[in-house]
């Protein structure tokens, strides 16, 4: 049993390599090279090389090993992670205003994540394919077409899911990290003087003696920890233990060996700054390394794509984005999903970015602001969790978290110097995402307020129907309702136009809780309102996809048996009109109306058979 358990743990750890560490693991392709980019004013002198490698070492140790692996991974919600989860965890049982503020921080984090998701696949695959220029400069014109082809194919096969090919991700990344370690270790053996960079005085002296150059250079140094957020975001899939084991036993040693190896190469040959990663390898290994690097960056891109699907689904269920099609690509893994609209929007953004920036060096300017912004928000939310849930004292939070926040904010400030050179791009994507999410949330609140204002109290309505019932027809009718307090508009319109009532009426409200998963026992609240009337409130976690079939199974456990094929579903379809009434700016109302018109119908989202649905329109002025 123990041997089998150990094998299972190792399999999960191997799988985590392919998903969690793809982005972080491909940073050696460009991070050190960009730290010596000409505009930064730092030359690859022995002192400069030791200073930068020292900064890399301590950045990885502080940000990844200490902050994320030791601290942030502790802040799980039933095993789940991610910045929205952290915001939900921090805001739980807080007053409404404080809760709204913390959830807003979570939304900003989601926006920054989406901004980062457009940059990561572009810079990763582009930096790998640029190895062609190292093999032979004549191949330079083919870099962009090959990069675009690889990414178009990757996005084009997303609807098949990653269940099959995903099994190869772990072994490929295992080989990748092994090659990173071997190349670095060999070069360190040739020039062990680079190991002096472990001494933090090299980093501190550089920052003290050349503060201006050091500050700007930090904007490139942070590239060595891009992708760290994935450790926390993917915790629900692989577990804290597997992620920590993979980091400590393989990923961290491989990354450090490779960065130190690149530094050793530069000490020996400063001209290798042209592309220190590829020049670590002997010429006969250049082409196989190019193939392996491209595979590794495709895997890193896949992790970002899957992460974006997951974050968008979470935002949809929490009511921050309109409903859209969510396809499950695996019968066994609930987390493996495909969102067609997100897929093609993401690809469109990536293609525009690649054509605009043309090279990984130009793209590096756009990379960093979103990453460091997310890191700073994570630390802020972590401080709230530490105070409220872990019961840390103020002095302990000040001792542990305040220095981490200072590091995050320093990196963020350093990256703002790249704003005009390209840093504006992920911020633009982030602002657009935040605008869409806040507009949708506010719009739905306005719609719900107006529907409740126009409707009748449920209890009084049921009493009236029992006292003076209309014509009863056989069968069961389910009325989907957004509120548990009032009568659904579909019911009022049905009585107004058809003047009939079914023998059994169920008012169904689906609510998303601020927990990731709920047990089957927590699925429904069933209330018998009177003869022939039932109210069902179905609860789902924000990581679950609401299922009508599961709701009816839970009802059957409570002796309310409902057969989908013999049930009629009544829904109200809102026709929204933008007006000058108070609520939202006119242009935001227009955006909300457009999103509402193009959102997935409730029938499709809940997979209700179309031939069992009756839709009744309601006109609402915003």
Q: What is each PLM-predicted segment?
A:
Residues 1-622:
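The structured alpha-helical core of multi-pass membrane proteins
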């Amino acid at each position: 049993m123990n041997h089998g358990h150990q094998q299972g743990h190792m399999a999960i750890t191997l799988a985590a390599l392919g998903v969690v560490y793809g982005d972080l693991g491909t940073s050696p392709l460009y991070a050190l090279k960009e730290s010596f980019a000409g505009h930064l004013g730092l030359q690859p002198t022995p002192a400069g090389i030791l200073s930068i490698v020292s900064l890399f070492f301590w950045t990885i140790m502080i940000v990844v090993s200490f902050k994320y692996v030791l601290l942030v991974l502790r802040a799980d919600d039933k095993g789940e992670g991610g910045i929205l989860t952290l915001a939900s965890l921090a805001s739980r049982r807080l007053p409404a205003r404080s809760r709204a503020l913390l959830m807003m921080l979570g939304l900003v984090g989601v926006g920054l994540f989406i901004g980062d998701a457009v940059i990561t696949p572009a810079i990763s695959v582009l930096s790998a394919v640029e190895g062609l220029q190292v093999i032979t400069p004549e191949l330079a014109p083919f870099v962009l077409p090959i990069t675009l082809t690889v990414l178009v194919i990757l996005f084009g096969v997303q609807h098949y899911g990653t269940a099959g090919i995903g099994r190869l991700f772990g072994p490929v990344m295992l080989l990748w990290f092994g090659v990173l370690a071997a190349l670095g270790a060999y070069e360190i053996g040739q020039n062990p003087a680079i190991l002096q960079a472990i001494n933090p005085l090299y980093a501190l002296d550089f920052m003290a003696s050349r503060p201006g150059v050091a500050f700007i250079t930090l904007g490139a140094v942070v590239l060595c920890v891009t992708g760290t957020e994935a450790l926390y975001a993917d915790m629900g899939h692989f577990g804290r233990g597997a992620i920590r084991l993979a980091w400590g036993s393989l990923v961290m040693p491989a990354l450090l060996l490779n960065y130190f190896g690149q530094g050793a190469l530069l000490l020996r040959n400063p001209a290798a700054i042209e592309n220190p990663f590829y020049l670590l390898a002997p010429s006969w290994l250049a082409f196989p390394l190019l193939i392996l690097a491209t595979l590794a960056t495709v895997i890193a891109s896949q992790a970002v794509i899957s992460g974006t699907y997951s974050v968008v689904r979470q935002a949809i269920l929490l009511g921050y984005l309109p409903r859209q099609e969510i396809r499950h690509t695996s019968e066994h893994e609930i987390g493996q999903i495909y969102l067609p609209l997100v897929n093609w929007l993401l690809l469109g953004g990536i293609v525009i970015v690649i054509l605009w920036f043309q090279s990984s060096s130009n793209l590096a300017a756009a990379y960093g602001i979103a990453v460091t912004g997310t890191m700073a928000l994570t630390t802020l939310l972590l401080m709230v969790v530490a105070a409220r849930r872990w019961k840390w004292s103020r002095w302990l939070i000040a001792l542990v978290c305040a220095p981490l926040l200072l590091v995050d904010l320093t990196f963020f400030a350093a990256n703002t110097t790249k704003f005009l050179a390209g840093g504006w791009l992920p911020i633009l994507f982030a602002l657009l995402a935040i605008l869409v999410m806040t507009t949708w949330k506010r719009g739905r609140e306005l719609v719900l307020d107006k529907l409740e204002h126009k409707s009748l109290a449920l209890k009084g309505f049921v009493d009236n129907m029992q006292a003076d019932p209309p014509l009863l027809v056989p069968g069961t009718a389910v009325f989907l309702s957004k509120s548990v307090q009032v009568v659904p508009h579909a019911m009022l319109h049905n009585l107004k136009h058809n003047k009939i009532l079914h023998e059994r009426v169920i008012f169904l409200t689906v609510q998303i809780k601020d927990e990731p998963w709920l047990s089957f026992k927590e699925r429904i609240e069933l209330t018998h309102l009177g003869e022939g009337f039932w109210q069902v409130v179905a609860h789902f976690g924000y990581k679950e996809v609401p299922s009508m079939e599961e709701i009816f199974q839970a009802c059957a456990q409570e002796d309310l048996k409902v057969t989908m094929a013999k049930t009629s579903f009544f829904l109200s379809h809102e026709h929204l009109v933008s007006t000058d009434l108070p609520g939202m700016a006119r242009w935001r109302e227009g955006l909300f109306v457009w999103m509402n018109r193009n959102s997935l119908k409730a029938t499709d989202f809940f997979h209700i058979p179309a031939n069992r649905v009756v839709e009744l329109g309601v006109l609402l002025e915003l």
